[in-house]
Design a protein with these regions (language model features):
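Proteolytic processing junctions in secreted/extracellular precursors
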Residues: 2-11
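Histidine-dependent nucleotide/RNA phosphoesterase domain, centered on the 2H-phosphoesterase fold
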Residues: 11-143
Length: 143
């Protein structure tokens, strides 16, 4: 069950990356898919509900520009995210499972509106749901 804290959290937050935290409804769906995935792949560990996120912007451009957005409260997307079926990705010794956001164009336009720029034009918006350790930093970043 989601803690009360999750209902108070902004959905878009400026951190070392610009993150979108899934809504409680989205988390519920992701959790059910993740549970089935872990049952079929017991070597994978789930990423905790409170760590689930979609990276909206990151990389060198974001590192340079993020301080300009530190105190900005961004509007949340005005659409519910939907996700594709989970896929496995491997890179540099890391293995993770992710779910791609179905509304790639809509989310790209949303980020461009927020930042008045598209810092990662080739970004594939996704949420990592499981990896070898369950630690979010151990997921493959770019799918």
């Amino acid at each position: 069950m989601l803690g009360f804290k999750n209902f108070l959290k902004e959905q878009v937050e400026v951190e070392s990356i610009l993150k979108y935290y899934p809504s409680p409804r989205e988390v519920k769906y992701i959790r059910s898919v993740r549970h089935k995935l872990i049952m079929k792949n017991p070597d994978m560990k789930p990423i905790g509900d409170d760590k689930l996120h979609v990276t909206l912007a990151g990389g060198p451009w974001w590192k340079k520009m993020s301080s300009k957005f530190k105190d900005v409260k961004f509007d949340d997307p005005n659409f519910q995210l939907e996700f594709e079926e989970p896929k496995k990705v491997e890179s540099s010794g890391k293995v993770s499972w992710y779910m791609k956001v179905k509304q790639q164009r809509q989310l790209k336009d949303y980020v461009t509106d927020l930042l008045q720029s598209n810092p990662n034009p080739k970004r594939v918006f996704h949420v990592s749901i499981a990896n070898k350790t369950g630690k979010v930093g151990d997921s493959v970043a770019n799918v």
